């Protein structure tokens, strides 16, 4: 059975199968969205990998990266949020819902998944949870 829980631990220290974070399209390329709380060295590593893979950050694009130094998760799933900046903290709930669903559809069979998308308020958090649930069942 699928369940959702909240934690105050930083995403990098969660011993999960997959960690989901967001990416955005910027005028300069692809960047990570806020909400991931990853250490700077991990951000630099992920940015380099995303550039090598020619990730765009477009809405619902999903890229899986394994063996991210400093991250306990087995893999990091980066899901696109569309146009934005690395400092933008709010996204439409439909975008968050869709991004979470797209990411979760790619991790079928994984027992534990942590989602660290930008959720500045309870409505955004609810949208991410709804999308994650939908992604598990599609």
Task: Pin down the residues of each PLM region.
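Glycine-/small-residue-enriched capping loops at alpha/beta junctions
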Residues: 1-138
């Amino acid at each position: 059975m699928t369940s959702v829980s909240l934690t105050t631990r930083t995403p990098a220290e969660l011993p999960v199968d997959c960690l989901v974070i967001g990416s955005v399209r910027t005028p300069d390329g692809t960047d990570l969205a806020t909400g991931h709380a990853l250490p700077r060295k991990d951000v630099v590593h992920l940015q380099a990998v995303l550039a090598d893979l020619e990730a765009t950050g477009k809405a619902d694009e999903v890229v899986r990266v394994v063996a991210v130094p400093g991250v306990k998760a087995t893999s990091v799933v980066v899901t696109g949020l569309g146009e934005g900046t690395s400092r933008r903290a709010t996204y439409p709930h439909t975008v968050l819902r869709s991004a979470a669903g797209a990411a979760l559809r790619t991790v079928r069979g994984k027992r534990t998944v942590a989602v660290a998308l930008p959720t500045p308020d309870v409505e955004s958090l609810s949208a991410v949870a709804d999308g994650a649930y939908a992604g598990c069942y599609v």
